[in-house]
Amino acid sequence: MKNVFLTGIFLVIAQLCFSQSFDKHAHRGGKSLYPENTIPAMKNALKMNITTLEMDLAITKDKKVILSHDAFLSPELVTKPDGTYIPKDSGFYYKIYDMPYAKIQTFDVGLKKLDNYPDQKKMKAQKPLFSDIIDTCEAYSRELKRPLPFYNIETKTRPFSDHIFHPEPKEFVDLMMKIIVKKGIQERVIIQSFDPRTLEIIHKEYPRIMTALLVEKVDDKKLAQQQFHFKNIPAVKFKQYPDHLNGVAGDLKFLSFIPPIYSPDHTLVTLQLVQECHALGMKVIPWTVNTKERLKELKDMGIDGVISDDPRIFE
């Protein structure tokens, strides 16, 4: 009983600290300005007074926890060691889960020009270790004499890609949490996921950690695309995570608890959705909002924070 009480107090304190002001998340460190999920991106976000650093985690063949949105070396972002690019149709060949970290480090993720992000600075960069990101961001915040940041960390798992792109959720969570606990940042961490399995593990085994349910609308077209890429996976595995086809209530049926944060695609947000989430005790932090006009519309609906590629919208 005492442990349950202390855990509750811990969560209340963490949420109070988290809720002092509108929560500004730099998506992948703010990919509009710097190469995504890299140390330079995170440091720039800290300089711009971002509240929370949003990032994605992947697991390598040798069980290193690294930052990567994609489960493979993306043809859109990556330059090979010889200076050439990965062919567009062969991205899945370079699966992170099949590669040791030392090999991944030989590929560059900061030099290739991205047409969708013309303001992104080009520089040599590699996919960093999660532990190095924490060490760097903690030290840089102190150097800037700024409050230590929150970390919004996505577990990049899906029921249909276990043992293909990542280990099973339990192993993924344990590898990640070992680093979080070692670095002592539990009170400033949010674990977000589209995969309810990882959130359930966090809730049951690491109850002090805040969680966020990521939500997107999965229609028949999107479902067909997923099934095309994973032809040998049973169809039922593609329907084991929230699809928003039945609203907030339908999404929450995938969990045994109500998470502190509901994080939908911003196009799904309505005044009614925000009010429904607030009535359930959930904050609403949508993704990915990249214009000041859309930010104002969402703030007028009462959202609690936002995830953006472009930290300049908060200026």
Residue ranges: model-predicted function:
Residues 19-315:
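Phosphate-group recognition and catalysis centered on beta-loop-alpha active-site segments
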Residues 1-22:
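Bacterial Sec-dependent N-terminal signal peptides
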